[in-house]
Amino acid sequence: MTALNVGVAMSGGVDSTVAALLLSEQGWRVHGFFMRLPLPGRDAQLQRVREVAGRLAVPLTVIDLEQPFTDRVIRSFVDSYRAGLTPNPCMHCNEQIKFGLLAEAMRAADMDRVATGHYARLVRAGGRASLARAAHRAKDQSYFLARLRPEQLDDVLFPLGEWSKEAVHRRAETLGLHFRGEESQDVCFLANGLSAFLASHGLDRTAGPLVTADGSTIGQHTGCWQFTVGQRRGLGLPDATPWYVTAIDGAANRVVVGKAADLMRQECNVHAVHWTDAPPSLPWRGLVQLRSRHTPAAAEVIADPAGTVRIVFAAPQRAITPGQFTVFYEHDRVVGSAVISRPTPATAGDRP
């Protein structure tokens, strides 16, 4: 059988390196593709990618995506914080950049398949691919891929879906490649920290009130964009028990604070609902993950007569955060996702 071409998104890190290595060993004609993005240390990163590609004897193509990344990912990120939301830029990047523009460039270069070093699996049935969790949950990245449409996944390969991170490191070391201690950061463009980044993009330190749920002002802050729901540090509110951020009003530059129990909510409204297949009839019941490090919890997705979509959990959840993505799972399979609009006001029944 004639070998097929596969384009591998290469970053110079251990995951994409081993993904390319495994595909080459399986008989694919591997071509590396590097996204040039407006990131700190990008020249050093490109040099590392070239070294790795040379070591693997795979050709490398550099795709300049600096402007689209700025327009679609960074601008959205900054605007979200300005509005008092907590965004997840990796979700936008995967949907629009990595599996959008980069994948399109690969296909235009006659690649038969698109591959990345993500820890996730694909289940193929009826000619379509659906996303599922990686075999090893500790590094599962299906949450970050949940906005991808079926047509974006049909020609995709995830070579590391069955691998543990430790096994990937060991495989790289058999080639004399050592990556331990080089774990990538959560948000690739925040090398100098969130506050410095947002300040450099025009978010100023405008003073505003710290208020309790009843509207009482108990302190001041220097910019609501410095906070996220559930945050404790930086409030400057000494007390016998800690205060936490429970809500952010970006328009009024106001941060609402409360005690630990005030972070517990049992439901929230969502928007931008995306189902990977045909939308199911509601209510839908399954597991819902509120953020990347949240343990999925039993919940149902319902719609009221006005069309507002709401998630109701079987038990209260901590720090439901507007702007974050929720991902819907049936067992290990991703079936949908949505963006959190705002937490429903707490009632006595919301608290444990």
Model-identified regions with their sequence ranges:
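AMP-forming adenylation/ATP pyrophosphatase catalytic core
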Residues: 115-122, 127-352
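ATP-dependent adenylation/nucleotidyltransferase module used to activate substrates
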Residues: 1-147, 157, 166, 173, ...
